[in-house]
Amino acid sequence: MTAVDTNVLVRIVVNDHPAQSARGAEFLRQQDRVFLAKTVLLEVEWILRSAYRLGRREILAILRGILAIGSAEVEDEAAVLQAMRWYEEGMDFADALHMASAGTQRFVTFDRALQERARRLGIAKIALL
């Protein structure tokens, strides 16, 4: 199994470099299994939001498309899916992924806004220091 870097996924979805987009897509089609680290998905969201100025709905559609790649094995997929649900409800994707990855562990922060967003979403495991 081969792990796929962020830039391969971004090139495929934004198609801003047609030759690399085509090579990346062809590579994925030829693979039985590829590994997608959750940190790669975190970077994909950040790049699409910050560099390409895509909105939350567009980013979620792209992330769902990436997760639907038949050959993809996603690291901690349950946490990624939970983070995507929280992101859809307005939480920052990085914060959501950090909290989802913590599982049932208590999550502490200095970020009052994060604590408030989590409280509104019914996430009780977050504590403000």
Predicted region positions:
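Active-site neighborhoods of divalent-metal-dependent phosphate/nucleic-acid chemistry enzymes
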Residues: 56, 69-115
